[in-house]
């Protein structure tokens, strides 16, 4: 560690033991959360604004306005419809369209049919993930999903193992449940962590009773507990443990970590063998530059315009409510009296 603390001079400072690796990943995750803190705070505020809530401004108390023309919601809804409506179709083509390459032509047709059938059989799942990723990109500014490999291995009569069933489902990852190491581009990211929540029974089945007793459990909330913004009734009913699945590209390992435990829960060597190592594609990031691989929502790029529209709407509404018809009239003129009364509404 450096003298200032909170920084890493060399990875060799941490012993290659579960306890030593826990200290290392605790430092990495702490630094990553600090880097993402402002984005998470702004993202939560933008989500609230999309749902009709208020977004705080530094220059004045804009949250006191009660009249709102939520063009941001209308804009995002329109963009979602324009950018995605149906599942994409699969097309597999040969790199070289040689006229006598029957093997390549047939292989391309087979692959296209296999992939098309996979999408059709899991169409609802893919559709849900794609819509969620797009919404996260357009509102807070970060869309992410990952692939999980499931494999069921059985033994035959001779005791030989064989793969009975295997699948690679696509999983949506909430924009607050992913973090990564400091970098300027996705290509340079040293590691990516995915957060999940496990019930005590699930922890027992995965790591045993002793580990389950030592973990901290709390109710899952819709927003990050570290943020000041809270939503009424956003707590889940279950007590769950916060588990981070960290894909370390530097060491080609996958580590399971939870804060407060004395060591990492588990470490595995790369079991997927993907060319890019990570089980996810590059994130859908809004307004990211090469200065730092960090998103910033589209709303903050145009928030002055949205706020100005709301201010004008507030002034119009206040003036409209203040305008009324006054005067004197003959008590016998019922029509005139009704006009004055209706003019007050």
Language-model segments: residues:
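Extended, charged amphipathic alpha-helical segments
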Residues: 234-345
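Extended, helix-rich architectural segments
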Residues: 1-266, 341
């Amino acid at each position: 560690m450096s003298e200032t603390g909170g920084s890493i001079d060399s990875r060799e400072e941490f012993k290659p033991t579960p306890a030593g690796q826990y200290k290392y990943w605790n430092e990495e995750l702490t630094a990553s959360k600090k880097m993402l803190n402002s984005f998470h705070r702004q993202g939560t505020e933008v989500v609230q604004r999309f749902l009709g809530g208020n977004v705080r401004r530094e220059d004045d108390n804009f949250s006191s306005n009660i009249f709102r023309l939520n063009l941001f919601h209308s804009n995002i809804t329109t963009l979602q419809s324009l950018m995605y409506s149906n599942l994409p179709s699969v097309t597999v083509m040969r790199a070289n369209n040689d006229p006598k390459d029957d093997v390549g032509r047939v292989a391309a047709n087979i692959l296209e049919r296999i992939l098309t059938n996979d999408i059709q059989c899991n169409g609802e799942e893919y559709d849900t993930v794609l819509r969620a990723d797009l919404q996260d990109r357009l509102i807070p500014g970060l869309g992410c999903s990952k692939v999980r490999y499931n494999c069921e291995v059985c033994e035959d009569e001779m005791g030989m193992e064989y793969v009975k069933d295997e699948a690679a489902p696509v999983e949506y990852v909430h924009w607050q449940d992913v973090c990564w190491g400091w970098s300027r581009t996705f290509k340079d990211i040293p590691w990516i962590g995915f957060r999940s929540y496990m019930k005590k029974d699930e922890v027992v089945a995965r790591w045993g009773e002793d580990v389950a007793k030592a973990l901290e459990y709390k109710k899952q909330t819709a927003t990050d507990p570290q943020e000041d913004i809270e939503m009424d009734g956003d707590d889940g009913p279950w007590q769950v443990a916060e588990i981070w699945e960290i894909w370390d590209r530097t060491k080609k390992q996958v580590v399971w970590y939870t804060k407060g435990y004395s060591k990492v829960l588990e470490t595995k060597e790369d079991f997927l063998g993907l060319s890019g190592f990570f089980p996810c594609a590059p994130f859908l990031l809004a307004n990211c530059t090469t200065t730092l691989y960090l998103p910033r929502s589209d709303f903050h790029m145009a928030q002055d315009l949205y706020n100005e529209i709301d201010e004008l709407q507030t002034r119009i509404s206040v003036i409209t409510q203040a305008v009324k018809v006054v005067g004197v009239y003959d008590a016998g003129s019922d029509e005139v009296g009704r006009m004055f009364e209706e003019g007050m509404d």
